[in-house]
Each structure stands twice: as C-alpha cells, then as structure tokens.
C-alpha cells in the first residue's frame, strides 16, 4: 500500500527534517512521516488493506498471527465498511470495529483507519438516488461498486462527513489508530460525472478559472461550430452528442481538470472534518495506476 501526505511543502525552510510535514489547515499538527504510522513509531510501515468484516470473526486471530509471522506492522481497515458501520440511517454499529482494532493493536499492528466512504450503503442510494453519478449518455451509474457517488452531490457529502466525524469522535484518541485513510482509489468510478450537480459545479469552476465569458470563449475556440456563449449559465459539460460528433477539446480538457479538482475538494472536506476532532495524526490515501 503506497501512501502519501497531502499538501507537503517542497521548499520548507524550517529546521524540521525533510520528512516533517506542515499544512495550512489550522486543525492540523506537524508530524514526522512515516514514523508515526507504525505502532512503536519506528521503521517502515509494512502491510496492506485488511477487510476483517468480509470474513467470519472466528478467523481474526489466525489473520493476526499470520500478519505477525509475515512482519506486518500496519494495516488499513474499514475501506469498504460503511454499510457495516451504519447498517441503517439511524443505526450505528462500531462493535466489530472496536474488537478488531483492539486485537490488532495488542499484537503490535497499527491501524490506518479508513473514512469508509469508498462505497456507500444501499439504503443511502435507495433514499437518495440523486447521489449517483451519471455517464455521458445521461444514465445513472448503478450502485454496488466503488465510488458510485457524485463528488459534487451536497447530499452525499453531508452523509459522508457525518460518518467521518463519527469515526473521529470514537477513534481519534485510540492509540492503536495511528493514521487516517481517506477515501480509496480516487477517480476509479466517478472521475467523469455528467449529472446536473456536476453541470452546476462545472459552471462555477469555469467562472472562477476564466473570470469572464470572453476569456472562456477565447480559450475554447468557441467560434468553431457556433459554440460562443453569452454567460457562464450557458456552459455545458461534454455529454454525448451523437456518434459522429466531436467534443470541443478545450471543453473536454477543462472537464478533466474539473473532475480532478472535485475529487480533491472532496478529499479535503473529509480530511478537515476528521482534523477538527483529531488533528494530530497523519492522513493518507491511495490511487489506482489507471486513474
């Protein structure tokens, strides 16, 4: 599992060693990286993702024994566990997570605890189908896979940040939890979202970037095929226009940049929600090479 610390400062002029990271976030604390990740604060964090909730609890002891035998000292837990932590909207179940964190910690294996937002429970999709992203044809992406949610959905963000705060309140001071794992494999299934939420957010993003519609028209070359716009309210996202049509390359490039920014903003929102409660532990995440 490869991790990184966000917002590290390349030209840090302080006397701190190079692996010490600072952040502009007032709720963050400086920390040494990656020493704090391990249980004893020494050595290299060695391990991977661990999904104990996908197995019968009676095999956990054997899991831990084999981890120790392999030299594992850190595992990421609960990446896909939102439905186990919050099986219903008004019901929370931390019992199983308490037990596995305690079992790992007592064995000297540190926990990089996930925000568990990589995939949402089905009850959330059933109640709020509008949180699903849409493909370029206007079809909602079906629930049941990773990242089946729109990063621009205010409804989804509200539920996700509530989960983050609940986890931080319960485990922020737990000595066995040495880091936070935000999201998972960003951009895997929702980097390109063509929903109305995304459209509205893209218009605001374009206005912030270009300032005037004249600047945007010039950058996108919108005189071609009569695409000139009179205001940012006319900006479109590159939805499907027909098999023989081509998307404006400037529009497409900015939509790619916009998608990246929306995922980064979502990461920061989760991070900050936890940092308000637990400011003294590092934050990590991971990526798929293809995204």
Label for each model-derived stretch:
Residues 41-45, 77-81, 147, 248-252:
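A short alpha-helix capping/helix-coil boundary motif
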Residues 138-291:
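Polysaccharide-binding and catalytic clefts of secreted carbohydrate-active enzymes
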Residues 50-51, 86-88, 151, 257-258:
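Short, contiguous strand/loop micro-motifs
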Residues 51-53, 78-81, 114-123, 178-187, ...:
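Short, solvent-exposed turn/loop segments enriched in Gly/Ser/Thr/Pro and often Arg
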Residues 2-10, 16-76, 87, 102-106, ...:
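N-terminal carbohydrate-binding accessory modules
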Residues 61-68, 73-141, 164-168, 270-277:
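Aromatic-lined substrate-binding rim segments of carbohydrate-active enzymes
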């Amino acid at each position: 599992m490869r991790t990184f610390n966000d917002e590290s400062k390349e030209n840090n002029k302080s006397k701190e060693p190079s692996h010490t990271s600072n952040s502009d976030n007032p709720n963050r604390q400086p920390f040494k990286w990656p020493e704090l990740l391990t249980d004893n604060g020494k050595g290299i964090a060695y391990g991977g993702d661990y999904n104990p909730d996908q197995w019968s609890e009676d095999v956990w002891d054997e899991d831990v024994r084999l981890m120790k035998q392999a030299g594992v000292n850190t595992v990421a837990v609960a990446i896909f566990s939102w439905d186990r932590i919050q099986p219903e909207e008004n019901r929370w179940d931390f019992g199983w997570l308490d037990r596995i964190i305690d079992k790992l910690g007592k064995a000297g294996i540190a926990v990089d605890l996930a925000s568990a937002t990589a995939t949402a429970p089905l009850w959330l999709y059933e109640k709020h189908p509008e949180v699903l992203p849409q493909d370029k044809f206007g079809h909602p992406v079906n629930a049941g896979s990773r990242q089946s949610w729109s990063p621009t959905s205010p409804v989804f963000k509200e539920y996700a940040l509530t989960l983050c705060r609940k986890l931080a309140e319960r485990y922020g001071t737990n000595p066995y939890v040495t880091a936070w794992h935000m999201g998972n494999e960003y951009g895997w299934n929702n980097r390109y979202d063509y929903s109305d939420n995304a459209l509205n957010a893209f218009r605001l993003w374009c206005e912030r970037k270009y300032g005037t519609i004249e600047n945007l028209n010039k950058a996108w070359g919108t005189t071609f095929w009569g695409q000139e716009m009179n205001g940012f309210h006319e900006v479109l996202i590159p939805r499907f226009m027909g098999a023989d049509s081509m998307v404006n390359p400037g529009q497409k490039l900015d939509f790619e940049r916009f998608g990246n920014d929306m995922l980064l903003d979502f990461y920061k929102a989760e991070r900050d929600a936890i940092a308000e409660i637990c400011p003294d532990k590092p934050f990590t995440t991971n990526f798929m090479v293809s995204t």
